[in-house]
């Protein structure tokens, strides 16, 4: 009896793990909400408008200088950008740093190939990431709709983000 129970538990776990890889990480098209049409300055004081990227897939990650997982996630987002930029993928890192730590943002972010935007007043983070989670990653589809959202970062999360991006690239 005990071996039957062990077998059933093992099969259940195996099925759960197998189906997890096939799950669609995207928000269903009919459930997607419009992304906030934000306007923020980059590190060089250039105004960046989300509306200027209409028709592209935009990955936005909210990060902070004090957030170790944020800094672990960024290299993976840079790799995605490098791999898919020719297919209309754009990546932005939006700093959620408070005025006390904003001076540290350029020192860290200038090493990255993806643009860092400054949300100095917290307007964008309060609307797109109201819980203030860091990192918090959103993928906006070509129609300007939020298609994927992810809280935090752990090793392996980059696979989920890439899966979502690939599925969006396949959408017509």
Map each language-model feature to its residues.
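Bacterial N-terminal signal peptides
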Residues: 7-16
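N-terminal "domain-start" segment that seeds a small globular fold
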Residues: 22-50
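Hydrophobic beta-strand anchors of alpha/beta hydrolase catalytic cores
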Residues: 59-60, 91, 137
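Active-site acidic short loop of glycosyltransferases
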Residues: 54-56, 86, 114
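Conserved redox-active cysteine motifs that mediate thiol-disulfide chemistry
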Residues: 54, 62-79
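Positively charged n-region of N-terminal signal peptides that target proteins for export
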Residues: 1-4
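Thiol/disulfide oxidoreductase modules built on the thioredoxin-like
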Residues: 106-113, 119-164
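Structural microenvironment flanking redox-active thiols in thiol-disulfide oxidoreductases
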Residues: 71-110, 120-127, 163
